């Protein structure tokens, strides 16, 4: 279905602001010209709420009351994702970046961060990012991240809702 990604992200922000992101600076930097995304709204909310929840936990870990999360959107021309079936390259130009100013992902976890049972937390099963990666792939998208002390950014690339770019 065609989905307004900004409506999804605004719902995620509202849910997070009253919960995990309480006490954090939560801002957005949206590209107003984005076309609709292709996808399942509930799954997209699940994807981004999980990423914002992780970002909030990282930002709170600063312990100085200055934790912040920024949600960016952009259109990236020419980004292609290889589809599993038939190895067709599919456009995934919608970019959503969720950035926090927490301590960063420990180096020893970076290679396996999207695997099940890998976690930076002492509590929890470590299934969050594995599920996020599976849901993103199911949408014909891509997820990656960059991390350094003081900043981690998760980037999700999604297809737009048009005949040629929607997964079969």
Residue ranges of model-derived segments:
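Conserved micro-motifs of the catalytic ATP-binding
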Residues: 36-39, 120
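Conserved catalytic submotifs in the C-terminal HATPase_c
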Residues: 10, 23-35, 74-76
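Short conserved segment of the HATPase_c
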Residues: 89-93, 105-116
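Short alpha-helical Gxxx[C/S/T] motif in the catalytic ATP-binding
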Residues: 128, 132
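Short beta-strand/loop element within the Bergerat-fold HATPase_c
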Residues: 66-79, 90
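Detector for a conserved hydrophobic position within an alpha-helical segment of the HATPase_c
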Residues: 136-137
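A conserved beta-strand-to-alpha-helix junction within the catalytic ATP-binding
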Residues: 1-13, 72-74
């Amino acid at each position: 279905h065609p989905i307004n990604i900004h409506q999804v992200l605004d719902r995620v922000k509202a849910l997070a602001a009253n919960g995990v992101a309480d006490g954090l600076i939560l801002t957005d930097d949206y590209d107003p010209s984005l076309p609709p995304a292709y996808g399942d709204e509930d799954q997209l909310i699940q994807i981004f709420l999980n990423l914002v929840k992780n970002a909030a936990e990282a930002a709170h870990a600063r312990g100085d009351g200055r934790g912040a999360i920024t949600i960016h959107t952009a259109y990236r021309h020419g980004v292609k994702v290889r589809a599993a079936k038939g190895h067709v390259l599919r456009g995934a130009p919608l970019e959503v970046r969720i950035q926090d100013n927490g301590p960063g992902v420990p180096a020893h976890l970076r290679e396996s961060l999207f695997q099940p049972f890998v976690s930076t937390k002492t509590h929890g099963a470590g299934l969050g990012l594995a599920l996020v990666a599976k849901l993103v792939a199911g949408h014909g998208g891509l997820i990656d991240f960059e991390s350094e002390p003081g900043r981690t950014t998760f980037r999700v690339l999604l297809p737009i809702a048009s005949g040629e770019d929607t997964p079969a």
